[in-house]
Amino acid sequence: MDILLQQIINGLVLGSMYALIALGYTMVYGIIQLINFAHGEVLMIGALTSWSCIGLMQEAMPGAPGWSILLLATLIACVVAAALNFTIEKVAYKPLRNSPRLAPLITAIGMSILLQTLAMIVWKPNYKPYPTLLPAAPFQIGGAVITTTQILILGVTVVALASMVYLVSYTRLGRAMRATAENPRVAALMGVKPDMVISATFIIGAVLAAIAGIMWASNYGTAQHTMGFLPGLKAFTAAVFGGIGNLAGAVVGGILLGLIEAIGSGYIGQLTGGVLGSHYTDIFAFIVLIIILTLRPSGLLGERVADRA
């Protein structure tokens, strides 16, 4: 029972990080029907930028509290990620908005590889130990433990979802997003600026990805130029699982995928008679993706809609 409780906690934390990343995927897809496969690399840039900032600030302000250094590094990383995603949208995606669907998809994959290569040049290919800036003493919950970083991850996910729901439902930008998603041409006739809305969506997605990247690096204690690929792919799976284009679906899909993966990693050895170990847990995400695409392509909370021309 203690093992199950621990895996549930681990799954909620893992799922929360998937959910943060999936929110970026689902917002962009909801507006312009684009799967931004470079989204995971924005996560990586955010994490590595914060790692660099933390190192510089620890040298410049040796007596500063860890939480203040982490907060300042997070703010800088979010600005860098937002500027990067804004530039990617303007340079790589905007010229292809009226192109066949395959063109922006291939461009997104190419941008992902380009960002990985640039990050490898700037930060080198070795793993960077990510510093522990929050209290390390874990809290006991029954027979399981949860760290301060994990509690922060859960809290940030709740705040992020609430903020996104409020933004989309109750703000002027949110109304413009919904109008642009419905029909960009009609939205433009009503005074909405689709280009501004799309740019804002990419910026918001980048901020969420940067925060998720910092949380990921903090939780696992390392950062590297390829760190965004697999979490990004799994977060895309989570977005499809929940219903891509649906904010609540992104979070539900992320949490469920995290739970499936964490619980599976705890019991995969027993289920396979010791043939497979916990390092095979990545297969669970893609088994879920295959099942969902087969049984319910629109996802758990997605609506069945006709494909746009």
Feature names for model-found ranges:
Residues 95-96, 101-170, 197, 263-282, ...:
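Transmembrane helix-bundle core of multi-pass membrane transporters
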Residues 31-87, 91, 267-275:
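Membrane-embedded helix boundary and interhelical linker motif in transport proteins
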Residues 47-52, 77-84, 111-119, 156-165, ...:
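Hydrophobic core segments of alpha-helical transmembrane domains in multi-pass membrane transport
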Residues 14, 145-223, 242, 247-253:
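Helix-loop-helix "hairpin" substructures at the membrane interface of multi-pass membrane proteins
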Residues 61-111, 118, 252-257, 261, ...:
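Alpha-helical transmembrane segments within multi-pass membrane transporters and channels
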Residues 1-21, 49, 60-72, 99-103, ...:
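Membrane-interfacial amphipathic/re-entrant helices at transmembrane-helix boundaries
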